Amino acid sequence: HRAQGDDVTLSRFVQPRLDEKLPYDRIYGSAIFSWSRGKLEDLQNAWLGAMVGGTGWDTEQTVEAVIREPEYEYYDYSIYPEFPYSLGFTQRGCRLNCGFCVVPKKEGKPRSVNTIKDIWRPGTPRCVVLLDNDFFGQTQWKERIDEIKDGDFRVSFNQGINVRMITPETAEAIASVKYSDDQFKGRRLYTAWDNLGQEKVFFRGLTMLNEAGIPSKHVMVYMLIGYAPNETMDEILHRFNRLNEAGCLPYPICLLYTS
């Protein structure tokens, strides 16, 4: 819309505010998670004709479907003027098929979509936030790693690395780049341990990272809680304590916890 000369306003409110310039020609709403569905329904009630979508609504109504383009990678940074970095995807899709995740259904098998050069905004810090769900699932991951190193970029693997699929080669590749947290204030690598049954394969991957020179203290581990059937508090604490003992930073995600 902005490219067509339209004025665009970003709002996190579903109801009209007193200071808003009305009326709007188009209203769009998007939600990431399904528990926000009620807010999208409120948006539709408040703004007749509003177009809604996102993974919290359904997986059919996408930006790409609306504008009839295969991939949409053109970000309007002007709506976040204080954000100094660059962000985007070098790949889409995922090799895994986790029951709680919409990515395989929405994006399919892994494929390369952009280079680091495509993502980085010249004139801004050489800091790139990658939104890839399975960076090493793409066939061109070596080219992207070389591009990160050759360009002296700092990179945040924001959506995490699949530790269950780490190999000595990919661990060495991660260690060879300046991986950072998403604020670029320190060294951080994100991954996940979703259930107790993954214990052996998780620590196998962590060991490979350690052997490549990545210390456990750099690794933040998202702990999904409440999704595994009949999960007990003892099992949850076992994961938490093992991560602490290994020197990792556990990050419990209790969004699905119900009892």
Locations of regions flagged by a protein language model:
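Glycine-rich beta-alpha loop elements in corrinoid/cobalamin-binding modules
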Residues: 1-87
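Canonical Radical SAM [4Fe-4S] cluster-binding loop centered on the CxxxCxxC motif
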Residues: 4, 81-122
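Residue-level recognition of beta-strand->loop/alpha-helix junctions
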Residues: 10-14, 223, 254
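Core AdoMet radical
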Residues: 28-32, 102-205, 216-226, 249-253
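Short catalytic/ligand-binding loop motif for oxyanion handling, primarily in non-cytosolic enzymes
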Residues: 36-38, 58-62, 96-100, 107-109, ...
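Catalytic cores of alpha/beta
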Residues: 230-242
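Conserved small/polar residues in nucleotide/adenosyl-binding loops
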Residues: 257-258
